[in-house]
Design a protein with these regions (language model features):
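Contiguous, structured surface segment used for ligand recognition
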Residues: 1-139
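Short C-terminal domain-edge/linker segments immediately following a structured domain
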Residues: 42, 118-121, 172-176, 202-206
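Beta-rich nucleic-acid/ligand-interaction surfaces
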Residues: 48-58, 178-189
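Aromatic- and acidic-residue-enriched carbohydrate-binding clefts of CAZyme catalytic domains
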Residues: 135, 179-219
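Single-residue recognition of alpha-helix capping/boundary positions
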Residues: 16-20, 155, 187
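The substrate-binding groove and active-site-proximal loops of carbohydrate-active enzymes
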Residues: 90-91, 140-153, 194, 207-219
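A conserved hydrophobic secondary-structure block that centers on an alpha-helix together
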Residues: 144-178, 182-185
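Generic, well-ordered alpha-helical scaffold segments in large soluble proteins
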Residues: 30, 107, 159-162, 166, ...
Length: 219
């Protein structure tokens, strides 16, 4: 098992597509929030010397999470190897590293994926595994219809988090139609003043009587 309880250094190189910093920062922030563990970031300008740099650092006794760029892998593919002192992750794009981090979190206690702290966990561990994963389909989508029912910003954020956990990559957001207009356009204010609201709603199957309560909303 790999333990997060000691000092853990996250080493990663600069990649030409950009975006790796945002992926790493998001993972570090989520681990800190859910486990209290503060990962030490170590960003190298030149990935060619990443392996040598890690070997020197490992001699000090630190555990490592190391990101390697493998340009021969598919855009969203990743390779994850967990050993007692090191986690190696290889991918060709920030998306691949992002999905690898999703899998890594799923190997940890369940509160990590839930995004909440758990004070009952005494030691944060990940089992030793070797995983090679790549998508079968390039378009893995979820469609939400808010023309008929308005969910609101916080619920949408939860849905996107769940999509990320399942490694879905397309959010089809249905916002406008004659049943409800959910996006504000300053030039056409009546679209939301009138189109975003209705005077009542039918609450349940078999009960077709409107409730008489004004309903709606927009972004």
């Amino acid at each position: 098992e790999f333990s997060f309880n000691g000092k853990v250094v996250l080493c990663y190189p600069k990649i030409k597509d950009g975006g790796i910093d945002a992926v790493v920062d998001n993972f570090v922030r989520e681990i800190k929030k859910t486990t209290g563990v503060k990962l030490v970031k170590d960003r190298l300008k030149d990935g060619l010397f990443l392996g040598l740099h890690v070997e020197e650092s490992t001699k000090k006794g630190d555990a490592h999470i190391v990101l390697y760029v493998d340009e021969y892998m598919l855009k969203e593919a990743y390779r994850l190897s967990v050993t007692p002192k090191r986690i190696n992750i290889a991918a060709s794009t920030p998306a691949g590293f992002f999905y690898a981090f999703q899998t890594l979190k799923q190997l940890m206690p369940r509160n990590v994926m839930a995004g909440v702290p758990d004070d009952s966990v005494e030691e944060w561990r990940v089992p030793c595994v070797f995983i090679v994963d790549e998508p079968r389909f390039s378009w893995r989508g979820f469609m939400l219809d808010e023309g008929r029912h308005f969910y609101g910003k916080e619920e949408i954020k939860k849905i996107i988090d769940v999509m990320a956990a399942y490694k879905m990559n397309r959010f089809h957001w249905h916002l406008t139609e004659d049943q409800g207009w959910r996006i504000e356009i300053k030039k056409y204010p009546k679209l939301t003043e009138i189109g975003a609201w209705r005077d009542s709603k039918v609450c349940a199957w078999g009960d077709v009587k409107p409730d008489g309560v004004r309903y709606g909303g927009f972004y």
